[in-house]
Amino acid sequence: MSRLMMLAATIGVGAALIATIVLEPLPLYIWNASASVPIGLYRLQPPDQFQVTELVAVQPPEPLATFLDLNGYLPIGVPMLKRVLALPGQTVCRTGLTISVDDVAVGEARDRDGRGRPLPKWQGCRVVGDGELFLMNWQSDDSLDGRYFEFLPASAVIGRVLPVWTWEE
């Protein structure tokens, strides 16, 4: 290998390393260890227009991120996987423990988590605003999602996720 090729390779590797530090690229794959969606490996893709039922990776914003971390649900910096259940213009209600979207019951909230700790509560109906999403894993009764923290900014979504390999019972 010539000196010029060696120098070019060294510069290329160095530039790639610096780019990963400076640009903080998003991960291409996410390992999900939560039972809210099937445990396994998911591929992260850029978000397009959101669709109801689409599975997305979300970086919890503050103060939610701190709440999740302090209570041992999810460390800061770890994305959570949730399904889009309502888009801007749709009406989401929590009446007692029942969650509904556009007058269709989609699931139940709980008063307490698996350790007996009280969960956040909200009540009433609200229209999802521009730049917001209602995220809820309706297939999992134990999912910590919009049942408790209501709407999230769409900007918190870091990508769509597609299963690569999952462990389903």
What are these language model-derived features?
Residues A109-R112, P118-V161, W165-E168:
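Acidic/glycine-rich C-terminal interaction modules and beta/coil loop segments
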